[in-house]
Design a protein with these regions (language model features):
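Helix-turn-helix DNA-binding helix
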Residues: 60-64
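Short, amphipathic alpha-helical "recognition" segments used to contact nucleic acids or chromatin
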Residues: 31-47
Length: 103
């Protein structure tokens, strides 16, 4: 997954959640949950912890590792989060396919 793919994934999530969270240092659950979902989807596509941390302007890959573990645990408990994950993956795949067709 390239940096442009990460940017596309981020734009899908901004549209899905109707808010930005990339540069936010806000630590409320609402924002951290969105960042953790981004991390989980990016890891689903094999993006490295360091690449995700750099994209999100985080200082350490350890934050990304923690977010991954937390979100995977939440998705096991809350089916609504698993549905959000699947919706985001589907929309990302659609936009990526449409983008490739347009080229």
């Amino acid at each position: 997954m390239t940096n442009s793919d990460l940017q596309l994934l981020y734009s899908v999530m901004v549209d899905y959640y109707q808010c930005t969270f990339r540069l936010s240092v806000n630590r409320t659950r609402d924002i951290t949950e969105k960042r953790a979902m981004f991390v989980a989807v990016a890891r689903h596509y094999g993006v490295t912890y360091c690449a995700i941390a750099q994209f999100l302007c985080r200082k350490s890959h350890a934050t990304v590792i923690h977010a991954t573990k937390v979100m995977l645990g939440y998705m096991d408990v809350y089916p609504a989060l698993k549905k959000q994950f699947n919706d985001i993956v589907d929309e990302f795949e659609f936009r990526k396919a449409v983008g490739l067709l347009a080229q």
